[in-house]
Amino acid sequence: MKILVTGFDPFGDDKINPAIEAVKRLPDEIAGAQIVKLEIPTKFNVSADVVKDAIAKEKPDYVLSIGQAGGRFELTPERVAINLDDGRIQDNAGYQPLNHTIHGDDENAYFTQLPIKAMAKAIREAGVPSAVSNTAGTYVCNHIFYQVQYMRDKMFPDIKAGFMHIPFLPEQVVTRPETPALSLDDDVLGITAAIKAIVSRDGKGDIETIEGKDH
């Protein structure tokens, strides 16, 4: 089994992004699966091409994209990607789409193929906070989540794909009072646990456990 794991470069006012820092520290093999690590740019109109080229070259069984979610205190496997770009800030190319559809002729939303409940449970059992999330936002994280699902639907039907957000690092919240943070070691531990869950649930689907939310 081969798993492509992507992480974004820094964006906005931050000089570091825990996503790519954690991805770079992952081992090359987890639970018998080969781990291919890829840095992608925080740019709406570029990131998808970088991932598409990597999928075509590596032919992974799974794609797990990792992104930063400042303000969250846990690792959050994402349930659904929506067909919308609505940038809170400009991306790293200076582009800020507002209420743009990603693909005008396609699905309003795609659901992940990853066992997100099993992933969240495995992360917590590793001692790292985690919960399933039902919104990946409308910035480049949701964009790449949707784009990879679109690629799966149109070009790479054999892959399974999804997205997971991770919190700020401690050094990112020095001037952000009361903002949650998680250490890089915990990020790596949590992502590793999530990947182990993906491998263990391959061909079995997700587990049946309560992860729903009222809002």
From Swiss-Prot:
SUPFAM superfamilies: Pyrrolidone carboxyl peptidase (pyroglutamate aminopeptidase)
GO biological process terms held by the UniProt record: proteolysis
Pfam families per record: Peptidase_C15
GO annotations of cellular component type: cytosol
Enzyme Commission number: 3.4.19.3
Record-annotated active site: 78, 141, 165
GO MF term (any one): pyroglutamyl-peptidase activity
Enzyme class per UniProt: hydrolase
Catalytic activity reported: Release of an N-terminal pyroglutamyl group from a polypeptide, the second amino acid generally not being Pro
Cellular compartments annotated: Cytoplasm
Matching CDD domains: Peptidase_C15
PROSITE patterns according to UniProt: PYRASE_CYS, PYRASE_GLU
Keyword terms: Cytoplasm, Hydrolase, Protease, Thiol protease
Role played: Removes 5-oxoproline from various penultimate amino acid residues except L-proline.
Subunit structure: Homotetramer.
PANTHER family attached to this UniProt entry: PROTEASE FAMILY C15 PYROGLUTAMYL-PEPTIDASE I-RELATED, PYROGLUTAMYL-PEPTIDASE I
Family of the protein in this entry: Belongs to the peptidase C15 family.
Protein name according to UniProt: Pyrrolidone-carboxylate peptidase
